[in-house]
Amino acid sequence: MTKAQQLLPLLQQLPLVMRESGLWQQDAPSTEELSSNEPFSVDTLKPEQWLQWVFLPKMRALVEQKMPLPTGFSISPYFEESWKSCPEYAPVLSLLVSIDEVCR
């Protein structure tokens, strides 16, 4: 099974788990907020906004277009730190750890 085949179901699950955890947003951030150059757009977006509006669309596009996937990254530590006082987000964190494992 290719990395893309392993990653696709995880990316499809992410919006569902985010909705169940109350993290999914209906309204997109502004173009200005989305154009941040900072890692995780920390200066303009909440962690869940970056996940929904930046990470997820980019990763889906890479998989759908059969482009090379990034490797050697780990996003879960950022979210673990950001949400350390939010145990209700544990299902999302678990999924992010799985995504990290596929992309190593």
PLM segments and residue spans:
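N-terminal intrinsically disordered, cationic/polar leader segments
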Residues: T2-L34, E38, F73-S76, K84-I99
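A generic short-segment signal for beta-strand/edge and adjacent turn/coil regions
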Residues: M18-S21, P47, M67
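Amphipathic, interaction-prone secondary-structure segments
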Residues: E38-Q52
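Mid-chain, well-packed structural core segment of small domains
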Residues: L51-Y78
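Short hydrophobic/aromatic patches at helix-to-coil boundaries
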Residues: D100-R104
